[in-house]
Amino acid sequence: MNPYDLEWLNRIGERKDIMLAVLLLAVVFMMVLPLPPLVLDILIAVNMTISVVLLMIAIYINSPLQFSAFPAVLLVTTLFRLALSVSTTRMILLQADAGQIVYTFGNFVVGGNLIVGIVIFLIITIVQFLVITKGSERVAEVSARFSLDAMPGKQMSIDGDMRAGVIDVNEARERRATIEKESQMFGSMDGAMKFVKGDAIAGLIIIFVNILGGVTIGVTQKGLAAAEALQLYSILTVGDGMVSQVPALLIAITAGIIVTRVSSEDSSDLGSDIGKQVVAQPKAMLIGGVLLLLFGLIPGFPTVTFLILALLVGCGGYMLSRKQSRNDEANQDLQSLLTSGSGAPAARTKAKTSGANKGRLGEQEAFAMTVPLLIDVDSSQQEALEAIALNDELVRVRRALYLDLGVPFPGIHLRFNEGMGEGEYLISLQEVPVARGELKAGYLLVRESVSQLELLGIPYEKGEHLLPDQETFWVSVEYEERLEKSQLEFFSHSQVLTWHLSHVLREYAEDFIGIQETRYLLEQMEGGYGELIKEVQRIVPLQRMTEILQRLVGEDISIRNMRSILEAMVEWGQKEKDVVQLTEYIRSSLKRYICYKYANGNNILPAYLFDQEVEEKIRSAVRQTSAGSYLALDPAVTESLLEQVRKTIGDLSQIQSKPVLIVSMDIRRYVRKLIESEYYGLPVLSYQELTQQINIQPLGRVCL
């Protein structure tokens, strides 16, 4: 072969897209054009080769994602087999000859007995259809469903790892792509298994059509006796069925191996994984050897065979057990060296540790980090809390809070704890409890007033105050339908957890904005606002930027509009070095958002005001130091002022509209700190944060 021919072949080999297109066109022509027996033999051999190669690939891949194109390959191979079946059927009916492979397969399987041949063919087809294909189809369906259900949790875990600095942005992007690819593959496999199932059904139909059509043609057109025609066409038909079903069986096994493969970080090929996991249980092999020995002692059983098998399995288990003991001793010696080398007391080496953790205790202690967001729930509630529903609720809460505040909250960890009280749950930030509550088995949580429940005749039990100024009641699940008809709001256990968690996250939102999170937000903006990011980093240090975002979020101001916030930092950052005052200027740049938020989209803002004398009193008590400014009001004046606020505002929960308190910009922050212990939910705004379109509706004025 000359160099030009080799170069031409190399070019064709590089254009795999053209090769696939040619293959698909060839499949179509195979169904239409008659093929000579020699070509059929070659194509049948190619079909068998493809199925064997695919089976070997399935055995040696480390993860199903390494062969993510398999669903498409399954479709192509199924079409190829069906086209072959059409071609061989045409040749059998027209010429009573479908090539050497078909005849040899048929003659070998039938073995001179038509009934035996058909029975063997049916057994192979039924095994493929009812056992392998049916099981693989179910596994693919469940895998697709579970893969989709697990996506939100995996995404949250990736977000948490990225914010904790465990992985960078690129690795997080790769992990998200892997999750998406995995979901798409299992979803495709769920549908692709229908090809294999349909192929098995088509094989059963084709064999009966071929026998019936062949006998009819042999008797009516070729003048053969019925018995002779049945013998000839049955051999060819069974051979055709076998050369189609054997590759189909191999590919069905391939599909089964791929969808049932459980991959992990240390996975290798399938044989190595199976061998590694089997030999890891020497006790099971020892017990198996004893059972085989007992089988050998049963009268009538082949004693010698079972004794040999019992000896092999028992000896293998004994040798593996000895090897495992030696490895455990070596690990214990290594642990002793590590602990003594670190200066730990000698008694520490005798502490009981699991085999998986030996030799790594020091590493775990050095690098173990607290969980940012943890929910501990009494283990008795595990069945009552539906995992999928709870996961959906938690994802919805994080999404809603992000859209409202712009804070990228970390993943939420749920832990069922046996040491907690009955029905108790605990919400912890950085593993420090900040809120707790109780879930009552067989009950729903209702936030409506007592009068409404009594009016409907629904018995209730008073619940604990999960949130300030909000009474809750427990109502039996028997009354769920009545609550729905009365349009009264109620919560399941999953909804109680997420509702309580949403308030906790909103209250402690500023704790989730640190330097790492600020850097992440800036990186997200670099693609569209590169120059702005460079300028703001030049003017405002990252630490000050973080503190500003914390102050905004701490007062329930969203930071999603990062462009306006950063532009305000650039505008005022060089003029104002005090972070508190700089935050006030940034708030004024967000006036449109603030007015829309607290006026509920209207032009009227119900508000309480401070008298000029009160403002002057507070202003004169502000002290400036090198460390910052603070309010130094006399305790008696503070108490008098708070008393006037209580008289003027009263109980916020009894007010229909959501009012605000408006003061001058220079004292706004100090007034907020002054009243937040009693009126945490009352927003404090400055006059500079109001747009021209807003009309203030005075509800009262605080005077001394």
From Swiss-Prot:
Biological processes per GO annotation: protein secretion
Subcellular location as annotated: Cell inner membrane
Transmembrane segments: 20-40, 42-62, 67-87, 112-132, 200-220, 238-258, 290-310
Alphabetized PROSITE patterns for the sequence: FHIPEP (PS00994)
Gene Ontology, cellular component aspect: plasma membrane
Keyword hit for Transport: yes
InterPro entries: FHIPEP_1 (IPR042194), FHIPEP_3 (IPR042193), FHIPEP_4 (IPR042196), FHIPEP_CS (IPR025505), T3SS_FHIPEP (IPR001712), T3SS_HrcV (IPR006302)
Tree of life domain: Bacteria
Keyword terms of this UniProt record: Cell inner membrane, Cell membrane, Membrane, Plasmid, Protein transport, Transmembrane, Transmembrane helix, Transport, Virulence
Keyword Cell membrane applies: yes
Topology of the protein relative to the lipid bilayer: Multi-pass membrane protein
Function: Could be involved in the secretion of the yop virulence proteins.
Family according to the record: Belongs to the FHIPEP (flagella/HR/invasion proteins export pore) family.
Matching NCBIfam families: hrcV (TIGR01399)
Protein name: Low calcium response locus protein D
